[in-house]
């Protein structure tokens, strides 16, 4: 590959330019999907290295210029920046390509010092009190001025760099699919005015193969292009390329400071002087205070100082400027909130923080303070600590990689960890040296990149557009491709939600716990979008209730795709401006759409379940439309399909109530629109077809209510109409909005520290609260009662879905090593925890049995509870009563099971899983002996349970069995257990050893097993029964090694 390097101490482009024809995609903007959460690796990372310096520093220099100190992205310019002690490297982010660099000379290093760190001048899309107004923040979203970043040196100089690139946010989004815009806040006129001619031949860079000038290597794909204008235009593969655009890097000015620069923030503002102009605001933290500098045309125009002592970090959080300092004597961290206009400081202490803080972050309006062994989340609104947690390792690096996920690097600089904001682990890399020794045992290997990955020491990382870049002190960097969750925000209370992941390779992963669906419930189904381009931004992926229809919106290309999962047919609708979409039941799609004039409306589309007609336009499917009032900002749209349909009492013209079920009108769902002024609830009125499908007849505006002051409408993630009120999930809290006696409305916070709603199915809601998986009934949640169950979340097993019918939680786990990465679904039954919680609350045993006995894992749950209580030497009274109730006749379902079938199965499985020294605790409370168990199996012809018990007895040595079945004082330590021990020693019939020597009983057992095997119609059951017979013959032989009895002969005689 031919790359022209820079030889002077000035930034230059590293690529040769070549003209290229592009077609600019037109169309209006759309709201980007903000409901992104989980991240998982697609594969192990690709390991790369930065190039060496072009000009040598000179002999005797001890600077290690391979040390990558920091990495940073400028998303609005599709740029990645890497900083070394003497260089600034500018990469085109997508596709990855080095396009410019600045190499500092020895004279520059001696005068200004080595590079230490860097900060970008960031356009904030929110208010900063005293700096950026609401109007300015919206304007700066689109007109962001110059691309500026600052490099701090170890001699307290600021090197101010500018990147000149002919691009806008709109173009970066459309051409590369990088989500850098929020178009809903901008008018169509502003969006179009920001566009320019992207076909500029002088902007496109092309890399040629140095051995063949006709072979172009540009974005990782080698394409041979013959000369000739017509062929160049007609080459179809050319359309799939992503262009690498020219940029220019300039060092504009060097700022000198007399004090140590501890930290700084760069902010863009828009001056109101004259016609207005862009200004750079530098907020620099010194040991003596915080200095605010206003820079216009790279000259300081204004300066002010706020006195803050011993500051270590500065940050903008929840529209406020803050400085953090640490008091090692008092062992506390001070959060100083700065009032810029009044030049005042409000100090709030965070106690019990003995360590120096590493860094601080802003996550969803909360201040996250990171220490080496602890992370604290501070609520800046109420000025109190929300929660804190400790990872099981010492932290070296921590930063957020999206609004929900923190990436932590351990002190060994090797392993990375994806944590949720409440400290639940999603994924971690733990490299085992054995993974590398087999492939790297060649000492003569020339390429050190093939050495063990454990040698890679991370110094920094950045994440953008489902790609994670980690850099190291050795000059190497890793490129990770990630799966990203697309949250399913619609709820069908009759069916569980799907879990959906996407990547940048046009792949979509779907998991559904529904066993009867076309999606395999044990595997993750991968769907490939019908495109070869790699610049698609997938804003939404939604699956309907029956798991037959799949809707995807590619927002940077204005394309809505609908896929039939059964027929594998795609329908494509171009030039659509979709801001949000939700499935309503099986075949209705509710869309929030933007029109050409900038107005928005809601549309309900009736999508055919069978193969769609390719000639039909999307507008032909519209069956309902609601125009959003002008100047109204829509924050979110919510669709809930109800579990219990509400019958509407409608009277005909002759005042006779209609009693025909097919014509009965039902409220089957609700659509809730949350705006900046009010919440609007639409009832969906339907009839139910005999096949089970809902047929929508009308949309009725049921309720309009003003948003309460203490609920931020832009934070609402879910809402439901309940008991003539509303239940919100907003800002990590469940908030109840109900009517009061005076006719007004009152809010009540029901739960806090809510991380995620897993699902809402029938009358139950499943959430992650802190470190726990919590199940509530909606009624209990509304009435502020206790949850049904709360279960700690295991590390690396985060719940993604649930199946109430089996009381099972489905979790996602990543199998990862140096060679491959694979996502697998694991299943955890929580029914035992649910029953145990009921027992602890002294719930009536009959109610527990009635509510849960028909769940599939019920017997397993009882067995698990019994085993746990035995091992803890707890009372077995309640659980044994519950086990015996399982075999009672059920009058409701007219079922009469065998008298002790369930109990025998539970007891035998429990004995199989606990040590023999605990058996007597069970037998004593059960008031049965081992002989009684075997006799009961024979009496009720329970061959399977009989076989299980025999196999349990066979697994123990005769001497050990006898020793274990005698209680020892040290084991139990009570007078009761001592008495039981003496009693069990005296009575030989309680000894399993003597029991197995009972000839007549063994013959009865063998007869039952042989009869069961001979009469079995199921081949598997027959095989199991014969296996048990052979095991019993082996037992009889072992018990009569000296051939003193006639056991075997009697057994044979019985079957002649």
Curated annotation (Swiss-Prot):
Function: The RIC1-RGP1 complex acts as a guanine nucleotide exchange factor (GEF), which activates YPT6 by exchanging bound GDP for free GTP. It is thereby required for efficient fusion of endosome-derived vesicles with the Golgi. The RIC1-RGP1 participates in the recycling of SNC1, presumably by mediating fusion of endosomal vesicles with the Golgi compartment. May also be indirectly involved in the transcription of both ribosomal protein genes and ribosomal RNA.
Cellular component GO terms, alphabetical: cis-Golgi network; cytosol; Golgi apparatus; Golgi membrane; guanyl-nucleotide exchange factor complex; Ric1-Rgp1 guanyl-nucleotide exchange factor complex
One GO term (biological process): intracellular protein transport
GO terms, molecular function: guanyl-nucleotide exchange factor activity
InterPro entries membership: Ric1 (IPR040096), RIC1_C (IPR009771)
Source species: Saccharomyces cerevisiae (strain ATCC 204508 / S288c) (Baker's yeast)
Key words of the record: Golgi apparatus, Guanine-nucleotide releasing factor, Membrane, Transcription, Transcription regulation
TM ranges: none
PANTHER family: GUANINE NUCLEOTIDE EXCHANGE FACTOR SUBUNIT RIC1 (PTHR22746:SF10), RAB6A-GEF COMPLEX PARTNER PROTEIN 1 (PTHR22746)
Lineage of origin: Eukaryota, Fungi, Dikarya, Ascomycota, Saccharomycotina
Compartments where located: Golgi apparatus membrane
Pfam families on file: RIC1 (PF07064)
Complex and partners: Forms a complex with RGP1.
Segments forming a coiled coil: none
Similarity annotation: Belongs to the RIC1 family. Highly divergent.
Additional record remark: Present with 78 molecules/cell in log phase SD medium.
Protein's membrane topology: Peripheral membrane protein
Record's protein name: Guanine nucleotide exchange factor subunit RIC1
């Amino acid at each position: 590959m031919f790359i022209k390097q820079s030889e002077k101490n000035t930034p230059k482009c590293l690529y040769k330019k070549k003209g290229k024809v592009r077609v600019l995609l037109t169309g209006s903007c759309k709201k980007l999907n903000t409901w992104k959460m989980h991240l998982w690796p697609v594969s192990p990372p690709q390991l790369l290295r930065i190039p060496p310096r072009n000009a040598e520093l000179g002999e005797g220099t001890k600077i290690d210029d391979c040390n990558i100190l920091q990495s940073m992205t400028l998303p609005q310019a599709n740029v990645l920046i890497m900083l070394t002690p003497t260089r600034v490297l500018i990469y085109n982010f997508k596709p990855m390509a080095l396009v410019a660099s600045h190499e500092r000379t020895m004279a520059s290093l001696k005068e200004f010092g080595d590079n230490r760190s860097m900060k970008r001048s960031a356009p904030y899309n929110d208010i900063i009190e005293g700096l950026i107004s609401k109007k300015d923040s919206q304007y700066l979203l689109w007109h962001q001025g110059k691309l500026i970043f600052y490099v701090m040196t170890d001699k307290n100089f600021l090197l101010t760099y500018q990147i000149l690139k002919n691009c806008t946010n709109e173009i970066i989004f459309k051409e590369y699919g990088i989500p850098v815009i929020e178009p809903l806040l901008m008018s169509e006129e502003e969006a179009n005015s920001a566009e320019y001619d992207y076909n500029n031949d002088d902007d496109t860079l092309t890399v040629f193969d140095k051995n063949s000038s006709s072979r172009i290597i540009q974005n990782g794909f080698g394409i041979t292009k013959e000369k000739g204008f017509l062929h160049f235009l007609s080459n179809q593969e050319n359309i799939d390329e992503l262009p690498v655009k020219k940029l220019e890097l300039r060092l504009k000015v060097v700022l000198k400071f007399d004090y140590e620069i501890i930290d700084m923030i760069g902010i863009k503002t828009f001056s109101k002087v004259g016609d207005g102009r862009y200004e750079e605001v530098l907020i620099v933290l010194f040991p003596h205070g915080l200095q605010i500098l206003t820079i216009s045309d790279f000259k300081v125009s204004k300066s002010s100082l706020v006195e803050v002592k011993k500051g270590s970090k500065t940050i903008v959080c929840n529209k406020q400027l803050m400085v953090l300092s640490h008091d090692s004597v008092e062992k506390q961290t001070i959060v100083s909130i700065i009032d810029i206009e009044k030049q005042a400081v409000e100090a709030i202490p965070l106690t019990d923080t003995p360590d120096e803080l590493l860094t601080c972050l802003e996550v969803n309006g909360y201040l996250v303070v990171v220490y080496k062994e602890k992370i604290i989340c501070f609520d800046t609104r109420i000025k109190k600590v929300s929660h804190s947690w400790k990872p099981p390792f010492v932290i070296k690096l921590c930063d957020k990689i999206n609004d929900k996920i923190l990436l932590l690097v351990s002190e060994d600089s090797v392993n990375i960890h994806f944590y949720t904001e409440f400290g639940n682990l999603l994924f971690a890399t733990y490299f085992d040296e054995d993974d590398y020794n087999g492939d790297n045992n060649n000492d003569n290997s020339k390429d050190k990149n093939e050495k063990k990955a454990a040698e890679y020491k991370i110094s920094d990382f950045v994440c953008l557009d489902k790609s994670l870049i980690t850099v190291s002190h050795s000059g190497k960097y890793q490129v990770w491709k990630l799966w990203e969750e697309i949250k399913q925000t619609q709820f069908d209370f009759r069916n569980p939600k799907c879990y959906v992941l996407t990547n940048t390779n046009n792949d979509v992963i779907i998991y559904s716990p529904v066993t009867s669906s076309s999606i395999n419930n044990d595997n993750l189904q991968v769907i490939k979008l019908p495109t070869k381009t790699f610049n698609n931004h997938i804003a939404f992926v939604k699956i309907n209730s029956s798991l037959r229809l799949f809707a995807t919106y590619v927002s940077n290309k204005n394309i809505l795709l609908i896929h039939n999962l059964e027929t594998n047919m795609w329908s494509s609708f171009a030039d659509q401006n979709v801001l949000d979409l939700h499935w309503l039941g099986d075949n209705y799609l509710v869309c929030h759409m933007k029109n050409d004039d900038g107005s928005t409306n809601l549309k309900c589309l009736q999508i055919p379940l069978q193969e769609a007609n390719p000639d039909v336009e999307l507008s032909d499917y519209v069956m309902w439309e609601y125009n959003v009032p002008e100047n109204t900002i829509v924050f979110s749209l919510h669709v809930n399909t109800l579990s219990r349909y509400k019958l509407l009492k409608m009277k005909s013209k002759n005042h006779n109530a209609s009693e025909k079920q097919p014509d009965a009108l039902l409220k089957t769902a609700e659509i809730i629109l949350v705006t900046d002024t009010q919440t609007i609830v639409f009832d969906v009125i339907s009839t139910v077809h005999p096949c089970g499908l809902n047929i929508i007849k009308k949309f009725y505006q049921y309720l309009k209510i003003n948003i309460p002051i203490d609920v931020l409408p832009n934070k609402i993630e879910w809402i439901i109409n309940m008991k003539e009120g509303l239940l919100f999930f907003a800002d990590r809290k469940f908030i109840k909005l109900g009517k009061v006696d005076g006719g007004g409305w009152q809010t009540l916070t029901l739960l806090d520290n809510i991380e995620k709603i897993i699902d809402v199915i029938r009358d139950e809601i499943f959430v992650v609260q802190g470190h726990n998986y919590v199940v509530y009934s909606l009624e209990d949640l509304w009435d502020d009662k206790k949850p049904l169950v709360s279960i700690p979340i295991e590390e690396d097993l985060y719940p993604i879905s649930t199946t109430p019918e089996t009381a099972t939680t489905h979790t996602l786990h990543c199998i990862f090593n140096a060679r491959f990465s694979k996502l697998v679904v694991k299943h955890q039954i929580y029914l035992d925890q649910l029953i145990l919680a009921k027992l602890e609350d002294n719930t009536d045993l009959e109610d527990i049995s009635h509510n849960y006995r028909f769940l599939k894992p019920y017997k397993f749950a009882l067995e698990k509870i019994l085993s746990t209580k035995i091992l803890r030497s707890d009372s077995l009274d309640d659980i044994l009563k519950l086990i015996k109730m399982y075999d009672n006749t059920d009058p409701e379902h007219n079922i009469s099971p065998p008298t002790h079938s369930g109990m025998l199965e539970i007891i035998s499985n429990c004995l199989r899983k606990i040590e023999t020294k605990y058996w007597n605790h069970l037998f004593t409370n059960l008031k049965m002996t081992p002989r009684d168990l075997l006799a009961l199996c024979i009496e009720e012809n329970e061959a399977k349970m009989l076989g299980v018990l025999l196999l349990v007895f066979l697994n123990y040595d005769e001497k050990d069995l006898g020793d274990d079945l005698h209680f020892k004082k040290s084991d139990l330590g009570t007078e009761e257990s001592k008495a039981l021990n003496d009693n069990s020693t005296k009575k030989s019939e309680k000894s399993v050893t003597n029991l197995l020597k009972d000839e007549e009983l063994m013959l009865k057992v063998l007869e039952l097993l042989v009869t069961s095997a001979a009469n079995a119609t199921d081949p598997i059951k027959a095989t199991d029964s014969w296996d048990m017979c052979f095991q019993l013959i082996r037992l009889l032989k072992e018990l009569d090694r000296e051939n003193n009895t006639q056991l075997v002969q009697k057994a044979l005689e019985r079957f002649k």
